[in-house]
Amino acid sequence: MPETGQESSNPPAKESPFSIKSLLTCEPSRAVRPHKALFTPIKGALDGAAFALSPLTDLTFPRLEIPAQRFALPAHYLERSPAWWYSYTLAHGGHTPRTEVPDKSLLLGPTSPVSGGERDSPEPIHPLKAELEAKDSESKSPEEIILEESEPEEGKKDDSGEDWKKREESPDKKPCRKKKTRTVFSRSQVFQLESTFDMKRYLSSSERAGLAASLHLTETQVKIWFQNRRNKWKRQLAAELEAANLSHAAAQRIVRVPILYHENSSSAESASSAANVPVSQPLLTFPHPVYYSHPVVTSVPLLRPV
């Protein structure tokens, strides 16, 4: 009896976390609780926005768990931010600010390959590059700068010179485009000029001067009038010759119709009389004779060739 009391007073043995029952029930292990307590101060620091994770080496948890904390961030932030293996700090609200790339670009150089995250981000301006450009601009002499700016000005001067030449040439061309003034002659002047032209087609200089003085005209006006009148006279002669040629061609095209004799009741008497009386020459003749078949006279030609 006392032995049984001692056995009942002993507490039951604790179950091992690696037993089959604990594994099947999938209960959270008690060993994880210290890990949660480790992250509790970080949560409070994030809410207060006063703690940064820049000195990651001072923390006790391993570095491999940092990506898990980073993967808890929003997806759109992960796309914009650079690669996660660089050192970063947590700002207010739990977001990690993007690390500046100029230091890395200095180390890698301009031709080094860049990761996919950095290709999307714009390339920062290198301060040394800006200084080199400033030195290059300062190293240029003022004469070179003036020469570079003077090239377009010389081209403008050339263009302006061409425009000036065109303006000078334009007044000379304007009188040629003006309409010529036409002289109006009176009836008496036209009659005197026509009578002189009928007598003489061409005038000498003295005759032209005397005619211009008598008609109160200039010698140039008389000269131009005679030139125009001679051109008109030549056109009239050409028209008359063309009309004569047309009339001659029309006369040659006249169709010659032969004279036909109709037979009547006294055909026999007419045939006999025709044999005795010579046939008069017709008005219209043909090169070939025309024969008419007759029962009495079979070979008597009615029309003779010329």
Swiss-Prot record:
Residues 95-181 are annotated as: Disordered. GO terms for molecular function: DNA binding; DNA-binding transcription factor activity, RNA polymerase II-specific. Residues 178-237 bind DNA. It comes from the Eukaryota. PROSITE patterns: HOMEOBOX_1 (PS00027), HOMEOBOX_2 (PS50071). It is found in: Nucleus. Keywords: Developmental protein, Differentiation, DNA-binding, Homeobox, Neurogenesis, Nucleus, Transcription, Transcription regulation. Gene3D superfamilies: Homeodomain-like. InterPro entries: HD (IPR001356), HD_metazoa (IPR020479), HMX_Homeobox_TF (IPR051300), Homeobox_CS (IPR017970), Homeodomain-like_sf (IPR009057). GO terms for biological process: cell differentiation; nervous system development. SUPFAM superfamilies: Homeodomain-like (SSF46689). The keyword Nucleus applies. Belongs to the HMX homeobox family. This is Homeobox protein HMX3. The gene is hmx3.
